[in-house]
């Protein structure tokens, strides 16, 4: 495997920002399909792939999402071309015979609600992070958020299923005029050590 170019690293990490304001420019559905085609290849435990994604685009879908949003996230989410609900399928293990066929991985989870919860949350969070990086790689900007009422989102979008919401990500083409100055980040010695 080779190292990415400095310009690619810059696009994915160094110059990429969390956007709160959006250009009035639509995101094509074909690009969202491509986004999932990249995201799905990020690693998860036993290839469990518990994340489920709802791309909220239409005015009707936005209206269903709106009552679940915290006040601070309302305007920017309504203005975003797309809001992704990153959900987690609490019955993900039912798909393991297909996704992880070389072991009886379903039996590791069946009846173990605590392990299901931990695995679904951890791995759907990973998949949401892959989605953010894939979006940046495809020229989109992202604004992840956790300020929302999960029960309301679940009732509006996942009723009658085993899927629960994890977090939200606004997607589109960011308006740089809406950016705050970049906040500080930790240095290596503040957060890491080598043993």
UniProtKB/Swiss-Prot annotation:
List UniProt keywords, sorted A-Z: Flavoprotein, FMN, NAD, NADP, Oxidoreductase
For this protein, the Enzyme Commission number is 1.-.-.-
Q: Which InterPro entries match?
A: Nitroreductase, Nitroreductase-like, Nitroreductase_HadB/RutE, RutE-like
Q: Does the keyword Methyltransferase apply?
A: no
Q: What GO annotations for molecular function exist for this entry?
A: oxidoreductase activity
UniProt cofactor(s) = FMN
> What Pfam families does the record tag this protein with?
Nitroreductase
Q: Which domain of life is it from?
A: Bacteria
The coiled-coil regions, if any, are none
Transport found in the keyword field? no
Listed PANTHER family: MALONIC SEMIALDEHYDE REDUCTASE RUTE-RELATED
Q: Which HAMAP family does this one have?
A: Oxidoreductase_RutE_HadB
Task: Name the family.
Answer: Belongs to the nitroreductase family. HadB/RutE subfamily.
Any idea what this protein is called?
Putative NADH dehydrogenase/NAD(P)H nitroreductase Bcep18194_B1060
> Species name for this entry?
Burkholderia lata (strain ATCC 17760 / DSM 23089 / LMG 22485 / NCIMB 9086 / R18194 / 383)
């Amino acid at each position: 495997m080779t190292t990415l170019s400095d310009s690619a690293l810059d696009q994915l990490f160094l110059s990429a920002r969390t956007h709160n304001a959006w250009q009035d420019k639509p995101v094509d559905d074909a690009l969202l399909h491509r986004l999932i085609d990249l995201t799905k290849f990020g690693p998860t435990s036993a290839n469990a792939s518990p994340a489920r994604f709802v791309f909220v685009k239409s005015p009707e879908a936005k209206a269903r999402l709106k009552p679940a949003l915290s006040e601070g996230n309302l305007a920017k989410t309504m203005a975003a071309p797309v809001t992704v609900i990153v959900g987690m399928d609490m019955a993900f293990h039912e798909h393991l015979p297909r996704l992880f066929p070389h072991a009886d991985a379903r039996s590791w989870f069946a009846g173990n609600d605590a392990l299901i919860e931990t695995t679904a949350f951890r791995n759907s969070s990973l998949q949401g992070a892959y989605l953010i990086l894939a979006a940046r790689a495809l020229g989109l900007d992202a604004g992840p958020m956790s300020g929302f009422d999960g029960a309301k989102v679940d009732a509006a979008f996942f009723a009658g299923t085993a899927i629960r919401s994890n977090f939200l990500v606004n997607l589109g083409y960011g308006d740089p005029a809406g950016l705050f100055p970049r906040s500080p980040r930790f240095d290596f010695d503040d957060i890491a050590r080598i043993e």
